[in-house]
């Protein structure tokens, strides 16, 4: 047998080059085969792409959810209602100036957005009536060192500028309240309160404490009162345009959500419970206000509801905020503040938020609640 025939190769000259015959070269015994078919490669690539997609969705889920939420329509003020809402401080409201947002409620109360009111008219009306506005804030435990000074300094710059203001700081350490230079016609009173062991109890103690203060010195020296959380700060004018008999704040995180998704208390045993067919908006307990008479009614309702829940051995999902939302369902607010008046920077940019007036401070719960 010829050598070339035995080895299965062709010599140069026979076909122009030395090459294998009978197809591909055979692999040696015991050597693994790493080649994948085209179908298997496609499946592998799809797996990796899906895995990276799910990882990206998990990592950026907050941004994606907020982008989707921003596309939920808010609705518009019905033409039949638009001429009706007026304001005792700003006069006729310009609802047509903000067609992209809801500027009134179904019961005819205005929702205050930037551009819908004239701030100068409100300031002049408040001065004409020589009003005194109370601002209450609770600074208990580490909330005092962490937030109070920034809150007060920013309030002096932006809250009811040019008006008579009395600050009521409720704290377990009145002697530690920082000194802040106050303008003419502005006072600060530090009021002692007991420090509770749980932060939930601190939150729920607010309503009975406010009720007592409104029935005492605060109610005697203030015409209107606003109750704010301390872990936020003013960044823009927060003036008399916000004043009304009963004022509620739309929650920045929930103002576009449909009603059935709102985090109301759903436990029927709770005094704060709302059914799936109840509720108008979700209101933020970080900002609410009104006349002394209206706030006496509000704080009494919430304090009583909390006591009933305590006797039943339950707590509402969002504590005093849940009871506040129940009150506003039963007693419609006469004015609503848009999320511009209490905004969270963690929420991605929204085109309808023109000038935030109040911003949430960074939440450091592990520090201030322990």
UniProtKB/Swiss-Prot annotation:
Positions of glycan attachment: 88, 130
Cofactor(s) recorded in Swiss-Prot or TrEMBL: Mn(2+)
GO terms under cellular component: Golgi apparatus; Golgi cisterna membrane; vesicle
Reported phenotype of the disruption mutant: Mice are fertile, develop normally and exhibit no overt behavioral abnormalities. However, compared to heterozygous mice they lack expression of the glycosphingolipid isoglobotrihexosylceramide (iGb3) in the dorsal root ganglion.
Membrane-related topology note: Single-pass type II membrane protein
Source organism superkingdom: Eukaryota
Gene Ontology BP annotations: carbohydrate metabolic process; glycosphingolipid biosynthetic process; lipid glycosylation
Tissue and organ expression note: Thymus and lung.
Lumenal-side segments: 66-370
InterPro entries hit by this protein: Glyco_trans_6, Nucleotide-diphossugar_trans
Annotated substrate binding sites: 138-143, 229-231, 251-254, 363-369
Active site: 321 (nucleophile)
Annotated compartments: Golgi apparatus, Golgi stack membrane
Molecular function terms, GO-annotated: alpha-1,3-galactosyltransferase activity; metal ion binding; N-acetyllactosaminide 3-alpha-galactosyltransferase activity
Binding locations of Mn(2+): 229, 231
Catalytic reaction(s) noted: a beta-D-galactosyl-(1->4)-N-acetyl-beta-D-glucosaminyl derivative + UDP-alpha-D-galactose = an alpha-D-galactosyl-(1->3)-beta-D-galactosyl-(1->4)-N-acetyl-beta-D-glucosaminyl derivative + UDP + H(+); a beta-D-Gal-(1->4)-beta-D-Glc-(1<->1)-Cer(d18:1(4E)) + UDP-alpha-D-galactose = an isogloboside iGb3Cer (d18:1(4E)) + UDP + H(+); a globoside Gb3Cer + UDP-alpha-D-galactose = a globoside GalGb3Cer + UDP + H(+)
Transmembrane segments: 43-65
Function: Synthesizes the galactose-alpha(1,3)-galactose group on the glycosphingolipid isoglobotrihexosylceramide or isogloboside 3 (iGb3) by catalyzing the transfer of galactose from UDP-Galactose to its acceptor molecule Gal-beta-1,4-Glc-ceramide. Can also catalyze the addition of galactose to iGb3 itself to form polygalactose structures. Synthesis of iGb3 is the initial step in the formation of the isoglobo-series glycolipid pathway and is the precursor to isogloboside 4 (iGb4) and isoForssman glycolipids.
Protein known as: Alpha-1,3-galactosyltransferase 2
Organism of derivation: Mus musculus
Lineage summary: Eukaryota, Metazoa, Chordata, Craniata, Vertebrata
Name of the coding gene: A3galt2
């Amino acid at each position: 047998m010829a050598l070339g025939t035995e080895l299965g190769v062709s010599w140069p000259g026979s076909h122009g080059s030395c090459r294998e015959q009978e197809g591909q070269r055979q692999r040696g015994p015991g050597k693994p085969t790493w080649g994948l078919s085209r179908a298997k490669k496609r499946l592998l690539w799809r797996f990796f792409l899906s895995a990276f997609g799910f990882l990206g969705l998990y990592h950026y889920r907050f941004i994606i959810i907020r982008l989707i939420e921003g596309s939920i329509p808010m609705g518009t003020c019905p033409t039949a209602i638009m001429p009706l809402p007026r304001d005792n401080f700003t006069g006729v409201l310009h609802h047509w100036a903000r067609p992209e947002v809801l500027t009134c409620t179904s019961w005819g109360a205005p929702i205050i957005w930037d551009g819908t009111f004239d701030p100068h008219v409100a300031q002049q009306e408040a001065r004409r009536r020589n009003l005194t506005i109370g601002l209450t804030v609770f600074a208990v435990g580490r909330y005092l060192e962490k937030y109070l000074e920034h809150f007060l300094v920013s309030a002096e710059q932006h809250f009811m500028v040019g008006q008579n203001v009395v600050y009521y700081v409720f704290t377990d350490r009145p002697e530690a309240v920082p000194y802040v230079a106050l303008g003419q016609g502005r006072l600060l009173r530090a009021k002692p309160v007991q420090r509770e062991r749980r932060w939930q109890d601190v939150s729920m103690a607010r309503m009975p404490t406010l009720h007592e203060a409104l029935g005492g010195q605060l109610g005697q020296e203030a015409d209107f009162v606003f109750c704010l959380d301390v872990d936020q700060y003013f960044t823009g004018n927060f003036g008399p345009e916000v004043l009304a008999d009963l004022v509620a704040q739309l929650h920045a995180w929930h103002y576009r959500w449909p009603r059935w998704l709102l985090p109301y208390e759903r436990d029927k045993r709770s005094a704060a419970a709302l059914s799936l067919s109840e509720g108008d908006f979700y209101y933020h307990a970080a900002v609410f206000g009104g006349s002394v008479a209206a706030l006496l009614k509000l704080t009494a309702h919430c304090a009583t509801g909390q006591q009933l829940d305590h006797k039943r051995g339950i707590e509402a999902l969002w504590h005093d905020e849940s009871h506040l939302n129940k009150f506003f369902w039963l007693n419609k607010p006469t004015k609503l503040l848009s999320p511009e008046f209490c905004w969270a920077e963690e929420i991605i940019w929204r085109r309808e938020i023109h000038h935030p007036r109040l911003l949430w401070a960074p939440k450091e719960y592990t520090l201030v609640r322990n």
